[in-house]
C-alpha cells in the first residue's frame, strides 16, 4: 500500500514512516499542510495520515479542502493527534470528515488496527 504522512513534527513523521515501512508499505511525507494539498491531488494514496495541530493550517481546515475538491473528495484520511478526549476525536472524525483516528505516540498495534479498516 502507499501512504502519505502530513505532520509538522519530524520526530512523529519519522516514527510513523518507519513503522509503515517495516510493515512493507511505501511512504511519502510532507512537513506542512500548505505543501500537501498538491501532493494529495497528484498522488494515488491508499491512506493519508494527517496531523491535527500544525502551524500554518490545522488538519481540520486541510481536510475540508480535500473533501471539497472532487478528485480528492473520497481520499481515505486518518487524523493523528495526541488529543484523546472523546469530544475531540468525534469532532475530527464526524464533523471534519476524517475516516479514522490514530492516537500519538503511534505504535505497531494501533497502526495495524487502522490499516485493517481500510476498504479493499
Where are these predicted regions, by residue range?
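Two-component/phosphorelay signaling modules centered on CheY-like receiver
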Residues: 10-28, 96
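Active-site beta3 strand of CheY-like receiver
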Residues: 44-49
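Receiver (REC) domain active-site loop signature in two-component systems and cognate sites
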Residues: 54
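C-terminal output helix
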Residues: 105-115
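Short alpha-helical segment
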Residues: 35-36
Amino acid at each position: 500500500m502507499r501512504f502519505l504522512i502530513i505532520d509538522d513534527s519530524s520526530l512523529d513523521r519519522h516514527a510513523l514512516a518507519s513503522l509503515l515501512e517495516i510493515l512493507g508499505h511505501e511512504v511519502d511525507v510532507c512537513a506542512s499542510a500548505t505543501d500537501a494539498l498538491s501532493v494529495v491531488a497528484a498522488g494515488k494514496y491508499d491512506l493519508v495520515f494527517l496531523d491535527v495541530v500544525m502551524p500554518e493550517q490545522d488538519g481540520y481546515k486541510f481536510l475540508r479542502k480535500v473533501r471539497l475538491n472532487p478528485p480528492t473528495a473520497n481520499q481515505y484520511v486518518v487524523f493523528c493527534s495526541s488529543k484523546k478526549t472523546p469530544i475531540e476525536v468525534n469532532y475530527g472524525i464526524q464533523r471534519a470528515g476524517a475516516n479514522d483516528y490514530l492516537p500519538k505516540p503511534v505504535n505497531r498495534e494501533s497502526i495495524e488496527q487502522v490499516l485493517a479498516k481500510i476498504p479493499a
